């Protein structure tokens, strides 16, 4: 019997993030408590998001609105990193970013976790920004997925390319 395998990745669907951003912008424009605060949310490059408002409290509330929209669109909070409010002239701004990919340090932690706590006979190999997990038994692969879902990792994980 051939080996079964799957890949562990940390990717975010940019279109879903864009939809969440547009929904948040619409809510910020229409909500009563944001009237007159000139609160905006927009993309900054490919991975960055910038939120601007007249007060520190309103910019924090805008971040909460955006996080709520991300959750509704099934995007993990581990994938969004919001900075601290920074004064910028008469306004406050928060620069956030969308984190994608598994760093080499995180990949080493995951492979060590699989080796130490996973079923015997499971192999984990680092391939760039993803990790390939293979085994002779599919049940072992499902046990590894359950292990990783239960683990407290610093990044969002998805399982793709199941063979």
Curated annotation (Swiss-Prot):
**Protein's UniProt keywords contain Nucleotide-binding:** yes
One GO cellular component term of this record is: cytosol
List where the protein spans the membrane. none
One Gene Ontology term of the molecular function aspect? nucleotide binding
Out of the domains of life, which is the source? Bacteria
InterPro entries, alphabetically?
Answer: DUF520, UPF0234-like_C, UPF0234_N, YajQ-like_sf
Q: Name the UniProt key words of this record, in alphabetical order.
A: Nucleotide-binding
NCBIfam families according to UniProt: PRK05412.1
Q: Which family does it belong to?
A: Belongs to the YajQ family.
HAMAP family xref list = YajQ
Function field = Nucleotide-binding protein.
> What's this protein's name?
Nucleotide-binding protein Mflv_5248
């Amino acid at each position: 019997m051939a080996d079964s395998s799957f890949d562990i990745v940390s990717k975010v669907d940019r279109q879903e993030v864009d939809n969440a951003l547009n929904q948040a912008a619409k809510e910020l424009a229409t909500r009563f408590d944001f009237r007159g605060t000139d609160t905006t949310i927009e993309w900054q490059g490919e991975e960055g998001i910038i939120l601007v408002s007249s007060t520190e409290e309103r910019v924090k509330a805008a971040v909460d609105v955006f996080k709520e929209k991300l959750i509704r669109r099934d995007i993990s909070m581990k994938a969004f990193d919001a900075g601290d409010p920074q004064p910028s002239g008469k306004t406050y701004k928060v620069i956030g970013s969308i984190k994608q990919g598994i760093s080499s340090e995180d990949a080493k932690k995951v492979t060590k976790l699989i080796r130490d706590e996973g079923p015997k006979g499971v192999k984990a190999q680092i391939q760039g920004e993803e990790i390939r997990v293979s085994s002779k038994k599919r049940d072992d692969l499902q046990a590894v997925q359950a292990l990783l879902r239960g683990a407290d990792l610093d990044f969002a994980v998805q399982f793709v390319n199941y063979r």
